């Protein structure tokens, strides 16, 4: 009978848990942000002035109709004439609409559509005799795209003359004039001198002539974007969209900004919006938006998905075979496939259409730079700059590329030229300042490293780095069976601001070290304003050096997750508890990333925990690969990546399974591995609590009512009810000490139950551990070996004991804590002092040394390390720490006196 009851109870528990899990999943689904996913992005609210202008009583019906079309709030009946339909089609990005075949459509609109389609010669021919400022601007734009720069510049002369004579009172003419001046700035290399003038013209157009002329805001956004001022560009483009929600050009610029910020969800939504604008156009072919294809392709290239980029572009190019932006991006996709011959063939086809245009070369170089193909990228960017020396973008990309590749002189030349052309370019300006800063730095060298540092106190750390760096090289190069062909440069940046500029060209960044291949930049581990704080730089640089070696071995063609996984794996340190908790949470809630999601999570996380999970899960998968397929498997994968083989093909070749099967097998293994951590234990604590809850009639009824209410709420949310989203927590019985003791009798050393027992014991002592608790704490530490809490408590108990033998027992627990500590010297210094008490001098010196590696500018730790070294009779180590103290505290003469005595002792020993 008891067995029957137990089986029935298990069944009921399982069924109830199924209901709970299903409801939780439903709640998660219905409570997701409606802005997420792959749907299109809603437009900003229509500006109040637009609606008032459309409804103004002094406009007749035809004028109101024209207003609705101009502001993109038309209904299909408003597109009653070819001219109005053509204007709406241009805005929506439907460049091949049938309206453009009608002669009654203004010649400028027909020519503009040709310009967008890439029919440049035809546009120029059509505009023969047209004298409007817009017509002349379109002619100049077509000539520029053809690479006929002198003719393009000459075509702008009439526009400049008209605007200089102040012969226009139309907002459209001023805005078209600015567009023409933007072309001239690219052609002549004078964007700096004209920038303020162009901004003034736009301000006059929108503030004085027509406050609702939305193209003024769009062109302002384009001008700001050219200067790398994405924040203000985004504000301007949103203003334009509030006055014309159907402006495809505005949406496309917003998409470019999203891609630049690696906001791939936003880019996807904007691309969907562009497709929606095109497909919703009356009687338009349902072929999507060419501008949407550009946004999608650029996003996929940034995600190192050239096949996806090519797929996004091919339909558009079938529809518009001479569309220059599409052709340029398609060549870039071919290059990122590492098919350089194919890319060159596409570049030749582009050059046949536009012999002097640098656009395709620039896009190829830019994409390859993003993919860290530095040598090939530099070649294409150099060719682009040669075709149009006055156009800053190729020079900007080249300068930033050379900076990341560690070729300072080449970076200086490119960025200096950019500064001459365009001092308003933010990234280039910051990076040029960085180069000029780096030129003042000093260096120290070893066999495999160059350490570059700002003169002054940073020398203390820089000179000490070489020996640990060579140890790092031995470990990493040995494990990866590869040695880079050149010395790796470690740039010790003096503070967080300079570090941010070093790795991104912008001063805001949230990390402490980064590798770009042959260069590793790190922030000095200091405390104070503009510093991130102290950290275990040896572990951090070991991680970054793995990137340097894997990138070198794979020719910079390794998937993002895989290089991060190798780097964490070769740090050689155990996981911290928070990482274990994060992984187990993802595992038990079916939230582990698939092979596509894990790469994106590094650079554009959707949740605050995504980036940390990507690091942790990648490391876990790397461990699985080594355990199941052997230590050579990761190296074989790297060799295939070096040959240009993509992950989708490489994994089956080496591992014998497809990526989806790999994730399934890894997940099954992960459950087993997590159990060895004392986590993902079965039965779970929730299951035990639920089982106990179901034994109580009143609690069982309350749980049922709660689930029913939650089901109703979830259904209402799914139906669009405006309820506040919340996390569901079932009403379960509270665990008591007798109940936990009973469970421990049934389930042995269950880690969750032991953790509860520790909590009960601490509650009795106001949170202070006692000697009476040590057995329980040791049991919990053994049951859940990844949790540092029992070790902290045991260390505290033993360190507080008067008995020396008990104090000695603190050491293994402090060692456990220290090996996991990354940002504080507390445990290392405590161990050093404890070992000094025990007269374990060599151990004390080792731990004091580790403390100074985490906090190299802490004078008190230097004194501790010098003392331990002297007791260990290691005079050279003592000399080093005393010399550091002289630099750190120059006003304390005692350091110089001690250093002098140690130097004398070394001399006496013949050193």
Q: In which residue ranges do the predicted regions lie?
A:
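Juxtacatalytic substrate-recognition/specificity segment
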Residues: 155, 194, 200-205, 235-236, ...
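Zn2+-dependent metallopeptidase catalytic core
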Residues: 41-82, 90-93, 147, 397, ...
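Single-residue signature of alpha-solenoid repeat helices
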Residues: 98, 123, 152, 198, ...
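Residue-level detector of the short coil/turn that links helix A to helix B
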Residues: 93, 118, 147, 193, ...
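Beta/coil-rich, acidic/histidine-enriched accessory regions frequently appended to metallopeptidases
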Residues: 28-69, 73-77, 82-88, 112, ...
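Amphipathic alpha-helical substructures
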Residues: 341-344, 404, 409-412, 558, ...
